[in-house]
Regions:
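Canonical P-loop GTPase G-domain recognition
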Residues: 170-222
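A short helix->loop->beta-strand "cap" motif at the edges of active sites that frequently abuts
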Residues: 158-161, 189
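Conserved G1/Walker A P-loop phosphate-binding module
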Residues: 2-88, 92-94, 101-112
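Flexible phosphate-sensing "switch/lid" loops adjacent to ATP/NTP-binding sites
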Residues: 2, 102, 121, 186, ...
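Active-site-adjacent beta->alpha loops and helix N-cap segments on the catalytic face
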Residues: 147-149
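A general structural detector for well-ordered alpha-helical segments in enzyme core domains, enriched
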Residues: 151-154, 179-180
Length: 222
């Protein structure tokens, strides 16, 4: 059965509310070519989205090193603040600063992944996490699609290339990417893909798509 909230958003296309704060000096970095020393080019990628959308899972799935996570147990004080809707009760921890991982794409490129905290009270950390990033992945749960509005608005405001990745949760209706694009009102140049955050191949293909787009954009502005 289709998500009512998604179709209501698609039908009305209201302005996205609750955007993350504007840039405090944060700026997108342009990917550079191969270094003169022959060392791999490193790129910073930010993984953003709502609370309990799967950011920690995505980073952990693809990272070739033990991912650094900064999770804390959900306490009674979190009730009414950290609400995960349909997945409430399944999530016992929450990211309070960031997730960090690394993946090597070929012999000449290394990606450093930074996952943002999903709660509104940690939005002040975004400027530092995004500083120097070449692109972002906005992870979406279609049952709570409005939770990703701040991330979409933030990347659009900074002019940072990003990909919208719809996380494929078990037992959840799979909307066509076109429906999600309409619900988010993102332009045609922003890729919208289906991505199971638990599937390494899905995550890798999403990151490759993002990097290719960031490189093309950098070449166009060179």
């Amino acid at each position: 059965m289709r998500s009512d909230s998604l179709w209501e958003t698609t039908a009305t296309n209201p302005p996205r509310q609750g955007a993350a704060p504007g840039p405090g000096g944060a700026a997108a970095a342009e990917p550079r070519g191969a270094t003169p020393t022959g060392l791999p080019v490193s790129m910073k990628i930010v993984v953003a989205g709502g609370y309990a959308v799967g950011k920690t899972t995505l980073v952990g799935t693809i990272s070739e090193i033990e991912p650094l996570t900064t999770e804390a147990d959900i306490t009674v004080e979190s009730l009414g603040v950290d609400f995960a809707g349909p997945v409430q009760g399944q999530k016992t921890g929450t990211t309070v600063a960031m997730d960090f991982g690394r993946i090597t794409l070929g012999p000449d490129m290394v990606l450093y992944l930074f996952g943002t905290p999903g709660q509104d009270r940690f939005l002040f950390l975004w400027d530092e996490l995004v500083r120097g990033a070449v692109g972002g992945v906005v992870l979406v749960d279609t049952r709570r699609i409005e939770d990703c509005f701040p991330a979409v608005d933030y990347f659009e405001h900074l002019g940072i290339p990003f990909v919208v990745a719809v996380n494929l949760f078990n037992g959840v209706y799979r909307h066509h990417p076109r429906e999600v694009r309409e619900a988010l009102s993102v332009p045609a140049n922003v890729p919208v893909v289906l991505c199971d955050a638990r599937n390494r191949l899905h995550v890798k293909e999403t990151l490759v798509l993002l990097v290719e787009g960031a490189l093309r954009r950098a070449q166009q502005h060179a």
